[in-house]
Amino acid sequence: EAFAKVEQAGRYDGPLNTARVYFAEGNLDGATQALARAVAMDPKPPVWTSAWLSGEIARQQGQFDVAVENFKSVLYDQTEERNKRQFDFSLDYVVRNQLGSAYLDLALAASSAEDNEGKDKYLQLARSEFEKVLTIDSENLMAHANLVTVFERLGIEDQAEFHRQANLRYKPDDNASNLARRPARQKYPAANRAAESTVIYLLQRPGAPGLPPEAASKSAGVSTQENLLP
C-alpha cells in the first residue's frame, strides 16, 4: 500500500520496491509487471538496479541466459551516470556469485540435455566467476560451495576436496552464533527489528521522537538487501 502511494506520486521507487516485495514472496509475474512499470517511468530507476532485479527474476523463471546477460550488465556496463558516481560493481561479489550460479544452472541444463560441450563450457565460466569472488573475499562460503559442485562435475576431485574443506573451515558455528544472538536480540529490541531480512519500520508509535505518547501504531514494510545496489 505504501509503495502504491509512492507510485501514484510518479516515483519509480514505488513499483521498483513493489517488484522486490513480489519477488521475495515468490510472485514472479507480479514482480515482472511491477519492474516493467518502474523502467517505463521518467526518470527511470538506475539501470544497474533494474538489471540486477531482472536477472534475479529471470533466473527464478528458468531463463538462465537472460539472467547471465543482466548480471553481466550490472558488473561491466559503463554508463554516464555510473561513471559520474564512480560506481564499480565489478567488485560486488554478491552479483558475481549470482552470475556464476546462472552459469552453473546453464551447465546443469546442458548436462541434462547430454550436451557435454555446452556443459564443460558453462562449468568453466562458472568456475571463473566463483574464483574471481575468492580474490575479493577468500572466505566466501557460496563461492567455495559452488566450486565444489563445479570441480566434481569437471572430475577434478582434488580441487573439489580443497573447496569442500575450505567451506567447512569458514562456515560459522550456528550453535555458538545462536547462543550469542538470542540474548542480544532480547536486550536490544531496535537492533533485533533491524536485523530481520525484511524490516517492518513503525511509522508512528508511542514514544517516537516528535510524536505524542498516544500516537497510533502504523507500519510499512521496507525490504533490505545485503548488496551494493541501491
Where do the protein language model's features map onto the residues?
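Residue-level recognition of tetratricopeptide repeat
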Residues: 11-13, 45-47, 81, 92, ...
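Structural marker of alpha-solenoid helical repeat scaffolds
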Residues: 7-9, 41-43, 77, 88, ...
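TPR/TPR-like (Sel1-like) alpha-helical repeat modules
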Residues: 71-76, 141, 148-176
